[in-house]
Swiss-Prot record:
Protein name: Small ribosomal subunit protein uS13
Keyword Ribonucleoprotein: yes
Signal peptide: none
Molecular function terms from GO: rRNA binding; structural constituent of ribosome; tRNA binding
Subunit structure: Part of the 30S ribosomal subunit. Forms a loose heterodimer with protein S19. Forms two bridges to the 50S subunit in the 70S ribosome.
Annotated gene: rpsM
Length: 123
């Protein structure tokens, strides 16, 4: 496994697909990384030379926020929303959907919590 951005990316996959295993890198950013480093998108990670891997690492380090830094940034943004007491922050605090989804019948995953016990059928 090649180690890029603190993540072991799979060797048997194409470079564009393997880069998406890194948190914060989607398909469009993976394409941009390949173009910026001058690497063919369809080549497998196992076929990359060590200097190609170093190019990719340097490109990501220079211009992308990924993995732990990105997770920390997202958590700080959510904490900021909760601290200022805006509507989105209140929804986060109550563990309800934030983006306007209905909650009367849905949102079971986000709400979590207790389930009502179903009474056993009478025979």
């Amino acid at each position: 496994m090649a180690r890029i951005g603190g993540v072991n990316v799979p060797v048997d996959k194409r470079v564009v697909v393997a880069l998406t295993y890194i948190y914060g890198i989607g398909t469009s950013l993976a394409n941009r990384i390949c173009e910026g480093c001058g690497i063919d998108k369809n080549v497998r990670v196992s076929a990359l030379s060590e200097e190609d891997v170093v190019k990719i690492r340097n490109f990501i380090r220079a211009g992308c926020v990924v993995e732990a830094d990105l997770r920390k940034e997202v958590a700080m943004n959510i904490k900021f929303l909760m601290d200022i007491g805006c509507y989105r922050g209140l929804r986060h605090r109550k563990k309800l959907p934030v983006r306007g989804q209905r909650t009367h019948t849905n949102a079971r995953t986000r709400k979590g919590g207790s389930r009502l016990a179903v009474a056993a059928k009478k025979k």
